[in-house]
Regions:
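Signature of uroporphyrinogen-III synthase
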Residues: 1-222
Length: 222
């Protein structure tokens, strides 16, 4: 491990590989989860040939089926879809839920989708699809519970991975104006800006590794 040059808080657990990668560059990452995921039992699942939509890894992990045509967000969600259902199952991807909705509408042939999601899902995707006349069957497969807690020190940077985690964090904490903030995507960045004026760096894609790489870069290239 290099001599520490920055201390960063991740608001969700990260893999040991990413934490060690950052530490090797002198960026010390503490992980503290601000939300908890509780899987739900699902009885009504779509049959083969259904068009299925995923915008989170948690939703993919809770789904079981075959023969689906799958639209999903990129990054970790896409990788999980490939692992569980195979590359051939993917009908389209995009970097955000809003962009994914536009992709689905743009296909022109989709009449109905099964949207696997959590109980606190955002409205961009289903609203856009319904507006375009596409029927949306929502399948709630997990609950998201906020777990706010006060942090015990100041950090040089804080990484956020969902708008819900942002709400949980700021319900219990205030941060100095100099703290750098990092967001996994645009909706998460927008949630941060509702709570503070600190500068926010947004990952190019919804991918934890890309975000950690950005954090390392921002703390070592000055």
């Amino acid at each position: 491990m290099s001599k520490p040059i920055a201390y960063v808080l991740s608001t969700r657990e990260l893999s040991a590989v990413l934490v060690e990668k950052a530490a090797a560059k002198g960026v010390v990452i503490d992980s503290l989860a601000f939300i908890a995921i509780e899987p739900m039992k699902v009885v009504d699942l779509p049959g083969a040939s259904a068009v299925v939509v995923f915008t989170s890894v948690n939703a993919v992990e809770a789904a079981n089926g075959s023969g689906w045509k799958i639209f999903c967000t990129s990054g970790a969600t896409r990788r999980k879809v490939v692992k569980r259902f195979g590359e051939a199952a993917i009908a389209g991807t995009a970097d955000s839920a809003a962009e994914l909705a536009a992709t689905i509408v743009g296909e022109g042939w989709v009449k109905a989708v099964w949207f696997f999601c959590g109980d606190l899902r955002r409205d961009e995707l289903p609203a856009r699809l319904k507006q375009a006349g596409i029927q949306v069957h929502e399948v709630v497969v997990y609950r998201t519970r906020l777990t706010p807690q006060m942090i015990g020190r100041e950090y040089d940077g804080i990484a956020f991975f969902s708008p819900t985690a942002v709400e949980s964090f700021f319900s219990a904490n205030r941060i100095p104006a100099h703290t750098r903030l990092f967001a996994i995507g645009r909706t998460t960045a927008e949630a941060i800006r509702r709570h503070c004026d600190n500068p926010v760096t947004t990952s190019g894609r919804p991918d934890a590794e890309l975000l950690i790489n950005q954090i390392i870069h921002d703390n070592t290239e000055e």
